[in-house]
Amino acid sequence: PNAVDWQDSRPPDIPWPHTVVYESHVKGFTQLNPAIPPELRGTFEGMGHKASVEYIKSLGITSVELLPVHWFPDDQHLLDRGLKNFWGYNSLGFFAPASRYYGPAGIQGFRDMVRAYHDAGIEVILDVVYNHTAEGNELGPTLSFKGIDNFCYYRTMPDQHRYYINDTGTGNTVNTSHPRVLQMVMDSLRYWAESMQIDGFRFDLGTILGREPEGFDPRGGFFDAVTQDPVLSKLKLIGEPWDIGPGGYQVGGFPPGWGEWNDKYRDTVREYWKGDNVSNDFAARLLGSGDLYDQRGRRPWASVNFITAHDGFTPVSN
């Protein structure tokens, strides 16, 4: 990892209480920007172009969070309809940037993008999807892990191993309680942190990563491994604290050191915006959601406050 020349670029290391996150999509953010050269639009190089960086900087953003950039295929049901997977929440290559976002510089364009944001004092956070893969359910394609060791990499029904536990709503669930699978996830995170100088991660359906055979455990294998890792434990770690599995809603339940998407903040602010009588709840959310984060050594910054994101409606559509 240290063989890459980062030209003395250093991570900004923004304190959590001062962090302002901007969720963005590499292609969606750049593909129509006339200030970016046509050959760079829709690419990592376009995302790292001066026009992109200066705009984000002008907003007062401290951390840009990129929607999934791990390699992902287009689902067959989309291809059959002449469509493509735009968001990218169906990863398969956990160690490879999505080549569809490559510009003329290839993978170096990703590193150049990260360096451009670091030089501007802005962190780069990746939205990562380790909870499921693009291989789908028992009717889905065998692209990688199914063929390597199906029962190791995926959680299957105890009495019918042909069928997958579907706590993700996508057809399969990655078995992060298996030591080799956990090792793969940790190796992937270290690769992005060290070789690509990423400053943090937002974990899609993060509850799944903490679900052990007996249920969700904030002291479980995944959380324990991250806490003990000398590199990852120093990064910004943000969980989406829910899934559709048993006990899946875990807002306020992640371990110390983690931030969480706070949907109670989102919903309360939108209700207040509409004129609903939620003044007390609104005040509690603005003051740090102490009912959720004033325990177990957690801090107000653990609440990642947002009103809208890539999921759901725009604010005016509430």
Describe each PLM feature range.
Residues 27-197, 202-228, 273, 292:
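Substrate-binding/active-site clefts of carbohydrate-active enzymes
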Residues 1-23, 30-39:
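The feature marks proteins involved in alpha-glucan
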Residues 197, 212-213, 217-318:
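Conserved alpha/beta catalytic core and glycan-binding cleft of carbohydrate-active enzymes
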